[in-house]
A protein has these predicted regions:
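Flexible, glycine-rich beta-alpha linker
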Residues: 264-265, 280-284, 307-325
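Conserved Rossmann-fold NAD(P)-dependent oxidoreductase catalytic core, especially the SDR/UDP-sugar
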Residues: 241-284
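N-terminal Rossmann/SDR dinucleotide-binding element
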Residues: 127-212
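NAD(P)H-binding glycine-rich loop region in Rossmannoid oxidoreductase-like domains
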Residues: 197-235
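Active-site Tyr-X1-5-Lys
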Residues: 266, 280-307, 335-336
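C-terminal substrate-binding subdomain of Rossmann-fold SDR/epimerase-dehydratase oxidoreductases
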Residues: 338, 342-472
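The conserved cystathionine-beta-synthase
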Residues: 9-28, 34, 53, 73-94, ...
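Short beta->alpha transition motifs characteristic of CBS
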Residues: 11, 25-28, 32, 40-54, ...
């Protein structure tokens, strides 16, 4: 099937920045360079441009100076054997422009089409399969950097993306240790970079060879952020600003920022809060999220195209388990101590399972850039707004031996119901896992003897950060 070739065409005098914009929009990591008569001059990839930027070449430079002037091409009379002969010699080739006698582009074969052709020749396919540079069967071209990829959300997202065939790079300081990625560290499509998002040199190293960044690496949660306010501002705001600026400079234009529904603070009369509702952050954590959102969106220029995701409160099992999240905590208390203590209880919280949250991030990665550029999405489901009392009641119903105690002290002021219609309408995303699913999986795991060391500070962000600060 022929493509809309115009999506790939750039003029030989176009700048690197203009060409990168075209590459981002066609979504295939390549542009075809033509002259004023639309005759083929060469091709360039996003990787070529990013390597040039690292070398100090200006974004205003003409693409003619950078393009590959002698790429492998096909003529319009090509046969499947022509394609297989080429791929035998160049098994990592992902694109083949098809030219007519006048050197005008008639089509371009992309990765999946090349594989479909070569699969019909079993002997060739065997050679490709055994090659160290074998071609992947899916069209997944994106190379994803996840900062905080060993964290509660990141370790789940990393696995989901690897299962879908993506190449994933993780930049993580590993303050909670390496165990969350231990079982997948030998995956050939995973690159692990121990590093700190506060260090520019680590950022520059990590963003090379990627075209999408998911930024998760921050101090997470109100109590943890309150321990060292200066460090929170440095990591959650200043470092976030630096990594976003670096991505813009190096033309990594699909940037996904993990914000939080806590930026809304408190709902009025149980109003459903949508993306344009007034924000009212009640903590340093929430304020830094909101400031980061504004700074990141302020960097958008029509080419750098960030997306802001305001996460609902997360629950469920993860390779980097946490027991300082409301559903996880109350379930733990019910199973291990037989008692659930709720402070207040009338506060509303939107909830989402960590696996569903990772699915939502993947949906943003896979969406056409025009659908998600410079957008803010609440991430969750309307049916998953609960009061803390509702959560306690669900646990009590599932595990009736546990007692529920309500205390009218130390009441959390955060109270918000959130509207998630936008992400459902624009991206057809809905959570698939229920509150009951999350409670049951955690309870079952606890009953099987997992997390017997549940009091260990490693499961609680604030305790672990405080302990780490004392050590340092």
């Amino acid at each position: 099937m022929k493509k809309n070739i115009e999506l790939f065409l750039v003029h030989q005098n176009d700048s690197l920045k203009q060409v990168m914009q075209k590459i981002d929009h066609n979504g295939h990591g390549i542009a075809l360079v033509v002259d004023s008569q639309k005759k083929f001059m060469g091709l360039v990839t996003d990787g070529d441009i990013r390597r040039a930027i690292i070398k100090g070449i200006s974004l205003t430079t003409s693409i003619e100076e950078l393009m590959n002037k002698n790429p492998t091409t096909l003529n319009t009379n090509y046969t499947p054997q022509n394609v297989t002969d080429i791929i035998t010699q160049k098994p990592n080739l992902n694109h083949l422009p098809v030219l007519d006698e006048e050197k005008k582009i008639q089509d371009i074969l992309l990765k999946e089409e090349i594989m479909n052709i070569t699969r019909n020749t079993s002997s060739l396919f065997s050679k490709i399969e055994t090659s160290q540079q074998k071609i992947e069967l899916s069209m997944k071209q994106k190379r994803i950097l996840i900062t905080g990829g060993a964290g509660y959300i990141g370790s789940v997202l990393t696995r989901q993306l690897l299962e879908k065939g993506y190449n994933v790079t993780v930049l993580d300081k590993f303050i909670f240790g390496p165990s969350p990625l231990e079982s997948i560290k030998t995956n050939p499509h995973l690159t692990i970079i121990p590093g700190d998002v506060s260090h520019v040199e680590d950022i520059i190293k990590a963003i090379q060879q990627v075209d999408t960044v998911v930024h998760l690496a921050e101090i997470v949660g109100d109590p943890a952020c309150a321990i060292d306010p200066a460090a929170t501002q440095q990591i959650n705001y200043l470092s976030t600003s630096i990594i976003a600026t670096a991505c813009k400079h190096f033309q990594i234009n699909r940037f996904i920022y993990a914000s939080s529904c806590s930026v809304y603070g408190s709902t009025i009369d149980e109003e459903l809060l949508h993306e344009k509702s007034t924000t009212n952050p009640l903590s340093l954590y929430a304020r830094m999220k909101l400031e980061s959102e504004r700074t990141i969106l302020g960097l958008a220029d029509g080419i750098f195209s960030p997306t802001i995701l305001r996460f609902a409160t997360v629950f469920g099992q993860s390779p980097r388990m946490r027991f300082d999240l409301v559903v996880n905590t109350l379930t733990l208390k019910a199973i291990k101590e037989g008692k659930i203590t709720i402070f207040g209880g009338d506060q509303w919280r939107p909830l989402i399972h960590v696996a569903d949250l990772s699915r939502a991030i993947t949906a943003i990665i896979e969406a056409p850039l025009e659908k998600v550029k410079c957008e803010i999405f609440n991430v969750g489901g309307n049916q998953h707004n609960y009061t803390i009392n509702h959560i306690g009641e669900h646990i009590k119903t599932l595990y009736p031996a546990s007692d529920v105690v309500i205390q009218e002290k130390n009441i959390d002021k955060r109270n918000y119901k959130v509207d998630f219609s936008k992400i459902n309408t624009q991206l057809a995303f809905l959570p698939s896992l229920t509150l009951q699913d999350g409670i049951t999986e955690i309870a079952t795991s606890l009953q099987q003897g997992n997390y017997d060391n549940y009091t260990n500070s490693i499961y609680y962000n604030d305790k672990w950060y405080e302990q780490t600060l004392k050590k340092n």
